[in-house]
Amino acid sequence: MVDMDRISISLPTKLLGEFDEIIGDRGYASRSEAIRDSIRDYIIKHKWIHSLEGERSGTITIIYDHHASDLMERITTIQHDYSNLIVATLHMHMDHDNCMEVVIVRGDAKIIRELTDRLTSQKGVKQVKLNVMVPGGNIPE
């Protein structure tokens, strides 16, 4: 038998409700099993992103609450700190409260990861997605 640790987490009611719907749709026997699968997926994604090396191009997509205290200023400051990586940015107002920013990047994978981690850790950022492409010359035909 696998050793198990019991943990406790706090979640917003709406988020838990959506998670419970997914649990039902996917046929999980319990929340615990669904959470274990989610954590496994998170670990796999983290390992994949942190295994990237060399020159890469891609996008970092950020969804954030534009009402969050000085968040837009913090995001802009971080982007300026990595201006050597950033090729372009696109800003979209999703609704009254949320904005999406797409940052096109090109450079060393480790530095792109560092930028992504800094953006992810900002309070008020709801979601960050890194999509990395291999250099064009390395794409099989």
UniProtKB/Swiss-Prot annotation:
Cofactors that this protein relies on: Ni(2+)
UniProt superkingdom: Archaea
InterPro entries reported for this sequence: Acetolactate_synth/TF_NikR_C, ACT-like_dom_sf, Arc_rbn_hlx_hlx, CopG, CopG/NikR_regulator, Ni_resp_reg_NikR, Ribbon_hlx_hlx, TF_NikR_Ni-bd_C
Residues reported in the UniProt entry to bind Ni(2+): 80, 91, 93, 99
Keyword set includes Ribonucleoprotein: no
Record's cofactor remark: Binds 1 nickel ion per subunit.
GO biological process: response to nickel cation
GO terms for MF: DNA binding; DNA-binding transcription factor activity; nickel cation binding
Sorted UniProt keywords: DNA-binding, Metal-binding, Nickel, Transcription, Transcription regulation
Pfam annotation, one family: NikR_C
Gene3D superfamilies: ACT-like. Chain A, domain 2, Met repressor-like
Family the entry assigns: Belongs to the transcriptional regulatory CopG/NikR family.
Alphabetical list of HAMAP family matching this protein: NikR
Function summary: Transcriptional regulator.
Name used for this protein in its record: Putative nickel-responsive regulator
